[in-house]
Regions:
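Catalytic acidic motif of RecA-like/P-loop NTPases
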Residues: 59, 90-91, 98, 117-118
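Inter-Walker segment of RecA-like/P-loop motor cores
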Residues: 17-80
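Conserved helicase motor core of P-loop NTPases
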Residues: 117-197
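Conserved RecA-like ASCE P-loop NTPase motor core of nucleic-acid helicases/translocases
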Residues: 1-33, 113, 185-197
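Loop/turn-to-beta-strand initiation segments
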Residues: 16, 80-84, 107-111
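Short, conserved "post-DEAD/DEAH" coupling segment immediately C-terminal to helicase motif II
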Residues: 94-108
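Walker B catalytic acidic pair
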Residues: 87-88, 114
Length: 197
């Protein structure tokens, strides 16, 4: 909704907005969400489907070479966008995040979406959790952080949200009680030689 509202108010300009995610699957999901947001927008001045921003992977956004060693956009050749919305930011490693910000102009607004408690990057660095800094965060970045309390992906009452809350807030006994409660989804303990310790 931030994009549709920004376009409606004239704060954002069509063609100057980029949407990206670390993986192709996340980019497809982001594109579907943007499509739904535009279709639900009550304003008649929303851009038509051809003018709407298209989601892509971070590698495509930055113009990565086939082997991923070179990028078309960098500090000397900036991205041509005023606004970047990056989904699943918890999956972005330190090197990719550095490349992303190096390719942004000084006036470019960047919105990072993600859950710092899940889907960490495979490569080095836990950038989103470090940027969020936990509950004790202070300073300019803390002033820009928004924490959503409602999950749009998991339905209320599915139970898994309750278990995640127990784990994320450091309540091991409550998590164990949830796991042992027969009304909750059944968990299977996996054993075998192919399972990492």
């Amino acid at each position: 909704r931030i994009i549709t509202l920004g376009l409606e108010l004239g704060i954002l300009q069509p063609g100057r907005i980029a949407l990206a995610a670390p993986t192709g699957k996340a980019a497809v999901r982001l594109q579907e969400q943007i499509k739904d947001a535009f279709e639900q927008s009550p304003r008649s001045n929303s851009p038509n489907a051809d003018d709407r921003p298209k989601a892509m992977t971070l590698h495509r956004l930055l113009g990565a070479s086939a082997d991923g060693s070179r990028f078309r956009h960098h500090a000397d050749k900036l991205l041509p966008f005023d606004f970047l919305l990056i989904d699943e930011a918890s999956m972005i490693d330190l090197l990719m995040m550095a490349r992303l910000f190096a390719a942004c102009g000084p006036e470019t607004r960047v919105v990072l979406l993600g859950d710092p408690d899940q889907l960490t990057s495979v490569e080095a660095g836990s950038v989103l959790p470090d940027l969020c800094g936990g509950e004790s965060a202070s300073g300019k970045l803390a002033e820009c952080r928004v924490h959503l309390n409602i999950s749009r992906r998991a339905a209320e009452g599915t139970g898994i949200l309750e278990l995640a809350e127990h784990i994320n807030t450091g309540q091991p006994q409550a998590a164990l009680d949830w796991i042992q409660d027969p009304k909750n989804p059944h968990l299977h303990q996996v054993k075998g030689a192919n399972v990492a310790p």
